[in-house]
Amino acid sequence: MAERGELDLTGAKQNTGVWLVKVPKYLSQQWAKASGRGEVGKLRIAKNQGRTEVSFTLNEDLANIHDIGGKPASVSAPREHPFVLQSVGGQTLTVFTESSSDKLSLEGIVVQRAECRPAASENYMKLKRLQIEESSKPVRLSQQLDKVVTTNYKPVANHQYNIEYERKKKEDGKRARADKQHVLDMLFSAFEKHQYYNLKDLVDITKQPVGYLKEILKEIGIQNVKGIHKNTWELKPEYRHYQTEEKSD
């Protein structure tokens, strides 16, 4: 971009409001496959008991996923995506576009933030399972050598990077936070195996700090406070794809 350029403030003058929406990676990849200015789906905005409900439905033509991580695959992407609406939080966020002639235009000011999430379904669970399996495959492969390795390495009690890692781990005194989407993937994968988990087991599975894990669990799960499953967590109804077991008080 040029150091000096023309700035079109039409969007600011018209007080144009825009939404800033986070979408899953697979959804943006499917959108990119749409030809020309074709339709990628439908956005529905409705009122339910005074609350705004927003959802996106992906076009059926774009639902087929043919590769995952560069590997051939055959799976259908979830079509229904409810929005989780979030406030702007006192921030002033703006959207700019840049033309081929380096002209900047202010398109509008962000008035609403949201996260577009897939509705829990068999298709979504299958897609996440394939993604998790692909990401867990080793990137290094064993190879048979034709020649004898002549380089001599002396054994050491511990490597320097291991020493540094252990030192940092002791200094931190806590687990490092992983990406939120990665934690969600691990949780959904765990809840495919069992309906109920106590917090300690979920901490062991995800290797996440307790406070951070509980923040994420509150978005997708329910903590049981009574009955035979007291003090355990399970998925909220909208994220389940199994038959709910009967609870007793």
Curated annotation (Swiss-Prot):
Keywords: Acetylation, DNA-binding, Nucleus, Phosphoprotein, Transcription, Transcription regulation. The keyword Transcription applies. GO terms for molecular function: DNA binding. The modification N-acetylalanine is found at A2. It is found in: Nucleus. GO terms for cellular component: microtubule cytoskeleton; transcription factor TFIIF complex. Coiled coil: none annotated. The modification N6-acetyllysine is found at K22, K33, K137. DNA binds at G227, H229. Its main location: nucleus. One of its GO terms (biological process) is transcription by RNA polymerase II. The modification Phosphoserine is found at S142, S248. Heterodimer of an alpha and a beta subunit. Interacts with HTATSF1 and URI1. Interacts with GPBP1. Interacts with GTF2B (via N-terminus); this interaction is inhibited in presence of GTF2F1. Belongs to the TFIIF beta subunit family. This is General transcription factor IIF subunit 2. The gene is Gtf2f2.
